[in-house]
Structure formats: structure tokens, C-alpha cells
């Protein structure tokens, strides 16, 4: 399945299981491509530490043009959370480093230990995914991978500060065999959500 297709499929299934329309073009004023004390509040020191641990260039970060970030989907109503589908490239050594620096007691809708374990297993392959791509604030080989891990933190740290419920994350390893919207796929996702949303 092509990159992005599985994400669309999972979004559709989650929407069906929750009986809630997925908003795939949702924007938030506070969900932009650089960190600030104003947006991160009590988690500012954590995101700043994470940024530094990834060897980010703070001057480049703070002077780059502010751009609204996309989330894979947003589910409103009683759910009020961002949904993210994590493919292999999200399980890098950079992502492992970010999770290790998360504040204690952070509420998330996924198993941090499992994400760390998967990052340990897949980091070599994930680190090599588009390895030569750089960004303005991560201007080195592997920079885009570091930026991806940095921005994943926004999806985990900001909701608590900005009045949303914790981000729902599902990874590709949890949904092996899900290839279409059918009764079996809906049941599998329903069982997964029972674990994640309790």
C-alpha cells in the first residue's frame, strides 16, 4: 500500500468505529512548526530540551516562517483528539531520544514503552529513510528525520496544554493485515481503541 494510503484507510476505519466524522483539514492556531513558551506552557522546558538533544539550530528555528502543521485527522465531539498514524519512518533513533525526554506523568493514548521498543528495533531502517533530506533548523544529514521526531512531540505535548484530549496514535505494526474497511478490520480497530482510550 502506498505511503499515505494506509493512513487514509485507518482514518476511515477509526471514524466508522467511533461514529464520528474525521476532520482531515483541521488547523489550530497553536499548532505551528516551531516551539514557543506561549504555546507549550509548562512543557516548554521539555520541548526545548528535546530540540537541543536533536542538535536543532534554535536561531534558524525561531526565524523561519511560521507554518500551520497538519495532523492526520482530528475527531471532535466527545473525543476531542488528534489522530496520528505512525509508519516505520517515525520509529527512528531521534524519536527514541524524544520519548526518553518526555515529562513524567504525560498523558498519552499509546504505550510509550512500546514506541521505544519499536524504535530500538526499526531505528536503522527509519534513520535511512530519506536520510539526505535536511531542513532549515535541522541542517545536517538525517535532519528531516530529526525534524519528524521533533514535530511528533508537538502532537503529544500540546494537546494537554491546549485543552484537547491526548493524541490517539496507531502504528503500522498494530494493524498488519488491515487492508480495507470491513467487519474484521473494524473489529480489530475497535479492540485496539478499547485499550488506547481507557
Model regions and ranges:
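Nucleic-acid endo/exonuclease domains
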Residues: 1-198
Amino acid at each position: 500500500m502506498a505511503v499515505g494510503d494506509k493512513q487514509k484507510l485507518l482514518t476511515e476505519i477509526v471514524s466508522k468505529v467511533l461514529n464520528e466524522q474525521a476532520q482531515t483539514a483541521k488547523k489550530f492556531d497553536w499548532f505551528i512548526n516551531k516551539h514557543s513558551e506561549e504555546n507549550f506552557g509548562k512543557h516548554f522546558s521539555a520541548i526545548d530540551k528535546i530540540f537541543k538533544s536533536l542538535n536543532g539550530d534554535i536561531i534558524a528555528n525561531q526565524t523561519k516562517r511560521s507554518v500551520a502543521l497538519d495532523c492526520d485527522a482530528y475527531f471532535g465531539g466527545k473525543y476531542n483528539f488528534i489522530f496520528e498514524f505512525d509508519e516505520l519512518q517515525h520509529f527512528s533513533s531521534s524519536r527514541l531520544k524524544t520519548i526518553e525526554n518526555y515529562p513524567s506523568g504525560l498523558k498519552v493514548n499509546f504505550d510509550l514503552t512500546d514506541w521505544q521498543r519499536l524504535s530500538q528495533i526499526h531505528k536503522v531502517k527509519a534513520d535511512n529513510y530519506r536520510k539526505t533530506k535536511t531542513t532549515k533548523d535541522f541542517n545536517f544529514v538525517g535532519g528531516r528525520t530529526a525534524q519528524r521526531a521533533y514535530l511528533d512531540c508537538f502532537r503529544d505535548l500540546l494537546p494537554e496544554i491546549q485543552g484537547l484530549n491526548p493524541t490517539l496514535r496507531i502504528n503500522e505494526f498494530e494493524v498488519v493485515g488491515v487492508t480495507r474497511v470491513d467487519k474484521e478490520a473494524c473489529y480489530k480497530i475497535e479492540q485496539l481503541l478499547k485499550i488506547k482510550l481507557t
